[in-house]
């Protein structure tokens, strides 16, 4: 039987400085500077910087592109210039899933800089951008804070049906036949 992996937490890396860790992640950005490359990766909630050099990693990264999902293994090192104060020195990188098409927008840019139509038509991709995702993190924090306060005051949380002007789910009665 296969075991479900727990989601990566930043503490997993911070508690393993000098040790090797393996994690599944998405390639966010690749910056090559001479013989080394900085591969910024995203996990469910975190962005981490990895450092690739041919001396340390047995795998080439010439095939690697933004959006690819990979398993990486590397040594966690402290570096105040690294994202979250750490870097992972890559030892191994294996492809899980490649992107089948060119993204219509670049999620590694600070701001997407695209029209609202392009953003909404590609929402599953645009939400990979930290700036686009921040509004939902803010909303999550406000809702959790409000919920915790109300529960401490002995209120009951109720999930009521929503009343809307039109049929929310649709149905045969919305379609007219001539």
Residue ranges and their predicted role:
Residues 1-178:
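Class II aminoacyl-tRNA synthetase catalytic cores and aaRS-like
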